[in-house]
Amino acid sequence: MLELRLVQGSLLKKVLEAVKDLVNDANFDCSTTGFSLQAMDSSHVALVSLLLRSEGFEHYRCDRNLSMGMNLGNMSKMLKCAGNDDIITIKADDGSDTVTFMFESPTQDKIADFEMKLMDIDSEHLGIPDAEYHSIVRMPSGEFSRICKDLSSIGDTVVISVTKEGVKFSTAGDIGTANIVLRQNTTVDKPEDAIVIEMNEPVSLSFALRYMNSFTKATPLSETVTISLSSELPVVVEYKVAEMGYIRYYLAPKIEEEEDTKPE
């Protein structure tokens, strides 16, 4: 039997908005430690990893490890029926082929329940190795979102370079080029406005902007974003989910040859 009660129901709504455009169907895995999801996008270029730790829920009951296959578009439609202040409870019985979402208004004068059919989804669990990253950039998530959006109007690939001068985001397209440089800035009134750059080695990697823009759908979840870069490794773009977990997006860098053979 599974029963998870989340007082901040809006968090779950934001989590779904952050992953549903990247992944269509996925297994949510429940264990005693938390509620998690790990899935590749349909083109097998990006990976999303979500964890909501059990202690972040007001009530968390998971008698045995359970994997629930869901269509994220359908799940998002159901969660849109919840008010932003609603308390959301997720329930599933052992062996059942449905999951129930219950929405309670804070005043408890309205309770709605929605039942959704589960799916059988084959998914391989990918071991994500812990890696030492050459450069780690922590910056305001709204700023990162704005940079990705602005650069998308010029080109389709972003080059992220970290040097001792700072972090540079650049692109080139038919209409011209764009470079945006951010320098480390920790003398801010609010810690979430800081730009912190930890550079062990300089890096310069190219990524598809359409994926980066998709990752920025997680911006409402966190005021800061952490970007971890190493040559030869996928970039990790991480947003914290309140105090209870994270969403991490992994994206393989573009290889130089691919850029030379642009379709005519």
From Swiss-Prot:
Which CDD domains is this protein grouped with? PCNA
Any one cellular component term from GO for this entry? nucleus
Task: Describe its function.
Answer: This protein is an auxiliary protein of DNA polymerase delta and is involved in the control of eukaryotic DNA replication by increasing the polymerase's processibility during elongation of the leading strand. May be involved in UV resistance.
Q: Which Pfam families match?
A: PCNA_C, PCNA_N
What UniProt keywords apply to this chain's record, in alphabetical order? DNA replication, DNA-binding, Nucleus
Q: What is the similarity comment for this entry?
A: Belongs to the PCNA family.
List the GO molecular function terms.
Answer: DNA binding; DNA polymerase processivity factor activity
User: Which sections of the sequence are annotated for DNA binding?
Assistant: 61-80
Q: Which GO terms describe its biological process?
A: DNA replication; error-prone translesion synthesis; regulation of DNA replication
Annotated compartments: Nucleus
Primary localization class, coarse: nucleus
- Alphabetized PROSITE patterns for the sequence: PCNA_1 (PS01251), PCNA_2 (PS00293)
Know the name of this protein? Proliferating cell nuclear antigen 2
Q: What InterPro entries does this protein's entry cite?
A: DNA_clamp_sf, Pr_cel_nuc_antig, Pr_cel_nuc_antig_C, Pr_cel_nuc_antig_CS, Pr_cel_nuc_antig_N
Q: How does it assemble?
A: Homo- and heterotrimer. Interacts with POLH, ATXR5 and ATXR6.
Identify the domain of life: Eukaryota
